[in-house]
């Protein structure tokens, strides 16, 4: 009938994939560079090692590998894709790396672009991609979270260099009668953004007589760890509780809590405030550290492949980080197990 709104479609989460950086750096190895030790790092962060890309391993390499793996699990070809969304803060090309991922995959029918929201990036990208599918404008999307924060870490600052690693994770979304994105909430607060950022260089250079310009490039990551912790343990439980209430779901109905892998203390505090038992909290911090936009899909893929997450499982997920940005999504996994 003329003027009738199109049906709102469900969004199925049907495949996952991940990719790891080539080099493994243990806490003991890192202590050879900075004044730290394994016990100090583990007790404060839960991290035992992290992966760091080699000089010839690009972000596109990691993102394409994760995407290819997700497509294989989903049983879809690159040509089936209508959309590729790459959540990253560390593109190989500042103008965008998603088109290069599209080319590497051979996804000739897909439009591809980057989305930057730091450690919340994957969750924001997942929600964004889902809207294209819900309207019927697109049928299938590949959402990738990938970062190489090792390029922007001050490796002589023991407070921050122990935290970060490189990696990528991906999920295939498909329009479906059964909805796998049951609800979401997203937030930003730029007024508090100074507690965690990766600022551009502020040095100037002469251009012509009477004029100057600011040189390109970025300074290392700047972080107030105490303030970031307070932000996370306050906002993440609150947004998850609000989402569960909106979706009429109780915490004890959840199969898994899938959080951004920033710090084990944060994961434990959020779970405690939600009364979610530790056995339901997914964590791979010990092996990978904080891989920024990659943490959620990388953790999901690992849990799917080792059999912890099964088709039909209900997951509450939250991403949080620089911006400040944070959000939550209630997901039902529909891929193979």
Swiss-Prot record:
The active site is at 119, 260, 290. One of its GO terms (cellular component) is cytoplasm. Its EC number is 2.3.1.180. Residues 261-265 are annotated as: ACP-binding. Belongs to the thiolase-like superfamily. FabH family. HAMAP family: FabH. This is Beta-ketoacyl-[acyl-carrier-protein] synthase III. It comes from Synechococcus sp. (strain WH7803). The gene is fabH.
